[in-house]
Amino acid sequence: MKFNLALALSLTVATAEAATELCKQWDSIIEGNFIVYNNLWGQGNADDGGHQCTTVKSISGDTVVWSTEWAWSGGPGQVKSYANAALQFTPTTLSSVSSIDSTWKWRDSYTGSDIVANVAYDMFLSSSATGSEEYEIMVWLAALGGAGPISSTGSPIATPTINGVQWDLYLGPNGAMQVYSFVAPSSTENFAGDMKGFIDYLTSEQGLSKDLYLLDVQAGTEPFSGSDAVLTVSEYSVNLA
């Protein structure tokens, strides 16, 4: 996932007193503990065009209800966007994080064809609180239509059990970042667990430093292609402690 935070905040910013629709590339809404982004960062990859709108239905404290509807064509294998709900917090070292408890209830429906997308958490790490992103940790709750994670080999490097689920772990570069992707064995539309478990595994088993700073905790969907797709999030909450 990519986006320009400064640009996003300088454009459309609203509050969630009523349902709000975000349709421009960098539209966002700030309320409670969240920023919700439409975030069409890869729309230029859609050679044959497309569109996407994200609707924020309610935000209250650490819980948000939202949906996103999209249609993208062209640019096979290229991510077009990452509509997401991002937790607002001050960057902190991994060693200072006790838990990242989260609940995510969602469903993905479509009447079109060729739907290729994921539904995933996204966390970014850096060696300093204000530094550029050096590591990305993705947790895929769904891989729709054959969507696959970034990988140097095309095969998992490990199959750890975290939060009672055995995940396929992939590793590969995205520009200057190293991307760790935990992929669930099947779509998980009702998730509840501690996201810190994924970080703990990487620090204990994959050599990730506990001195790294956690910059972002986000949850959303990356579409590659398809039409008439709707991701509906009936409940999303996350609490960093």
From Swiss-Prot:
Annotated catalysed reactions: xyloglucan + H2O = xyloglucan oligosaccharides
UniProt keyword terms in alphabetical order: Carbohydrate metabolism, Cell wall biogenesis/degradation, Glycosidase, Hydrolase, Polysaccharide degradation, Secreted, Signal
Localization, UniProt: Secreted
GO biological process: cell wall organization; polysaccharide catabolic process
Domain of life the protein comes from: Eukaryota
Enzyme category, top tier: hydrolase
InterPro entries the record matches: ConA-like_dom_sf, GH11/12, GH12
Enzyme Commission number: 3.2.1.151
Gene Ontology cellular component terms for the protein in this record: extracellular region
Membrane-spanning parts: none
Predominant localisation class: secreted
Segment forming the signal sequence: 1-18
Gene Ontology molecular function, alphabetical: cellulase activity; xyloglucan-specific endo-beta-1,4-glucanase activity
Pfam families xref list: Glyco_hydro_12
Role of this protein: Catalyzes endohydrolysis of 1,4-beta-D-glucosidic linkages in xyloglucan with retention of the beta-configuration of the glycosyl residues. Specific for xyloglucan and does not hydrolyze other cell wall components.
Family: Belongs to the glycosyl hydrolase 12 (cellulase H) family.
Name of the molecule in the record: Probable xyloglucan-specific endo-beta-1,4-glucanase A
Name of the gene this protein is made from: xgeA
